[in-house]
């Protein structure tokens, strides 16, 4: 059941991301990734909101949490996960780990894009 919940949430989240990105490009143009920026900010807000609510005020089942957080928000943006994990490190007092996590995530992520692009360019 959990796999189905994640799949349903991911399908919804990915379609929301696509729709929002198309809308933003039509509204403001495609020269800047407005859609991705909007998705990442909304997703970061949503994961913080949902997970704090789920642990303080609501009683979500594991399946519901997986559908919303792992599926929907994971399909919408993985940036929200990075943001919430950074929040968790900071609020637990692990400032150095949070800084290292953010810098390494962005640094290695960007390096991965360049590496992947480089490998793709040299393929026959």
From Swiss-Prot:
- Give the transmembrane region(s): 3-23, 34-54, 66-86, 100-120
Q: How is its activity regulated?
A: Na(+) is not transported, but it plays an essential structural role and its presence is essential for fluoride channel function.
> Which InterPro entries did the record assign?
FluC (IPR003691)
Can you state which reaction this protein catalyses?
Answer: fluoride(in) = fluoride(out)
Q: List the GO biological process terms.
A: cellular detoxification of fluoride
**Subcellular location, principal:** membrane
Which amino acids does the record list as binding Na(+)?
Answer: 74, 77
> Looking at the record's lineage, which domain of life comes first?
Bacteria
Cellular component, GO, one term: plasma membrane
Describe the task this protein carries out.
Answer: Fluoride-specific ion channel. Important for reducing fluoride concentration in the cell, thus reducing its toxicity.
List, alphabetically, the NCBIfam families matched: crcB
Name the UniProt record assigns to this protein = Fluoride-specific ion channel FluC
Q: Which organism is it from?
A: Roseiflexus sp. (strain RS-1)
What gene is this protein translated from? fluC
